[in-house]
């Protein structure tokens, strides 16, 4: 949960941890429970925006109302919709390659270094606008699609891409986290489909619920922490971390 939303690639850290400690998840549903915890963290922190989108769509479809706030939220909805498409397409086209990447610590190490350099370069971005446009959404969505690879940070690349597009840091971060919701939900549904044949003992369910709780708490804290860092314009700090971890893991996990 702690690394899920920090721009350090939680999937990359998971692969490296499995290599170092020889770990392996016994049940697919563990990932589903963890995803649920992080999903709820985003849902609660950005509940105002999510409620605004739902209300605006309801008014648009059933009441035919066009308030200024409704127009803004409808625009946000379409931006999120467009931003989700690239990840879906790339995920379907390169599913096998992505799955193979999760077996290679070398790929993770290189991608972490790549992510670190990208995050470092965000210090040179300049704010030009306050909101996310449709073209911005598509480009940020492509960045999210690239983050299917372990070692490529989803939050780092989506927020960083937003910064390079001239979007204010807080707005880029807000859009990034909202954009994570359909991805987390989709990943959970796919994992549930894969694990339909698995039987989960009651005591295991209790442990998974505890895992979901920890994922929620640490996910909540990591989002709050990252938002503070972004407001200070210091996203490149995470870049140093990713580069160091990438180089060390590349050397030590040959």
Residue ranges and their predicted role:
Residues 1-254:
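Multi-pass membrane proteins that catalyze or facilitate reactions on polyprenyl-/lipid-phosphate substrates
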């Amino acid at each position: 949960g702690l690394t899920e939303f920090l721009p350090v690639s939680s999937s990359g850290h998971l692969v490296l941890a499995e290599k170092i400690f020889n770990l392996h998840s016994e049940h697919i549903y563990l990932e589903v429970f963890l995803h649920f915890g992080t999903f709820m963290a985003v849902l609660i922190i950005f509940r105002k925006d999510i409620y605004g989108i739902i209300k605006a769509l309801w008014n648009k479809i059933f009441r035919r109302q066009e308030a200024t706030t409704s127009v803004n939220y409808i625009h946000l909805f379409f931006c999120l919709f467009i931003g989700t498409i690239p990840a879906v397409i790339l995920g379907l086209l390169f599913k096998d390659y992505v799955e193979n990447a999760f077996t290679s610590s070398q790929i993770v190490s290189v991608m972490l270094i790549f992510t670190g350099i990208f995050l470092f370069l965000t210090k040179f971005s300049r704010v030009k606008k306050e909101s996310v446009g449709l073209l911005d959404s598509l480009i940020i969505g492509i960045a999210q699609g690239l983050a299917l690879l372990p070692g490529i940070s989803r939050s780092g690349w989506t927020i960083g891409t937003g910064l390079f597009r001239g979007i204010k840091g807080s707005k880029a971060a807000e859009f990034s986290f909202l954009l994570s919701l359909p991805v987390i939900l989709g990943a959970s549904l796919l994992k549930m489909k894969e694990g339909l044949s698995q039987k989960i003992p009651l005591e295991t369910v209790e442990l998974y619920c505890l895992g979901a709780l920890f994922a929620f708490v640490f996910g909540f804290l990591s989002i709050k922490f990252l938002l503070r860092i972004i407001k200070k314009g210091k996203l490149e700090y995470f870049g140093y971390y990713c580069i160091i971890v990438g180089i060390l893991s590349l050397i030590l996990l040959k």
